[in-house]
């Protein structure tokens, strides 16, 4: 299971990658593998203000649908429109082309409350 060390993670299997004053968000390799083949992604609206832990998107697979939660509070500033035509990018490249949304955090310091790669690995091991 791939867990890049350059980003933060949540216990609900989202990742958050700081880029300047924004944060790119997607789901982890573990999450996409558990979901199976992704067939649709319901993207949030740009401009929407969200709270940490709020359900902001939905990923639907052949097996199930799963809410995607905001890792920190902030404003959605961009969504990955490529997922409308090719939702399978979430499976093929969960840490790259399969990102879901970008938000501008209310406070970048909130990222410190998230897990690092080692902490996320421990979560996965406790769920196994």
Swiss-Prot record:
Family: Belongs to the GcvH family.
Cofactor annotation comment: Binds 1 lipoyl cofactor covalently.
Cofactor(s) recorded in Swiss-Prot or TrEMBL: (R)-lipoate
Cited function: The glycine cleavage system catalyzes the degradation of glycine. The H protein shuttles the methylamine group of glycine from the P protein to the T protein.
UniProt keyword annotations, A-Z: Lipoyl
Family matches, as InterPro entries: 2-oxoA_DH_lipoyl-BS, Biotin_lipoyl, GCV_H, GCV_H/Fam206, GCV_H_sub, Single_hybrid_motif
Organism (species): Thermus thermophilus (strain ATCC BAA-163 / DSM 7039 / HB27)
GO CC annotations on file: cytoplasm; glycine cleavage complex
PROSITE patterns noted in UniProt: BIOTINYL_LIPOYL, LIPOYL
GO process terms (BP): glycine decarboxylation via glycine cleavage system
Domain Lipoyl-binding: 22-104
Protein name from the UniProt record: Glycine cleavage system H protein
Complexes and interactors: The glycine cleavage system is composed of four proteins: P, T, L and H.
N6-lipoyllysine PTM positions: 63
């Amino acid at each position: 299971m791939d867990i890049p060390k350059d980003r933060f993670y949540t216990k609900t299997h989202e990742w958050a990658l700081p880029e300047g004053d924004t944060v790119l968000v997607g789901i982890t390799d573990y999450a996409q593998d558990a979901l199976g083949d992704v067939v649709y992604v319901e993207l949030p609206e740009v401009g929407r203000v969200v709270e940490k832990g709020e359900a902001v998107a939905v990923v639907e697979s052949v097996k199930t649908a799963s809410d995607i939660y905001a890792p920190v509070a902030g404003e959605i500033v961009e969504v990955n429109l490529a997922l409308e035509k090719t939702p399978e990018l979430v499976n093929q490249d969960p840490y790259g082309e399969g990102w879901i949304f970008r938000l501008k955090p209310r406070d970048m310091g909130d990222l410190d409350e998230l897990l690092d790669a080692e902490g996320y690995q421990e979560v996965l091991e406790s769920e196994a």
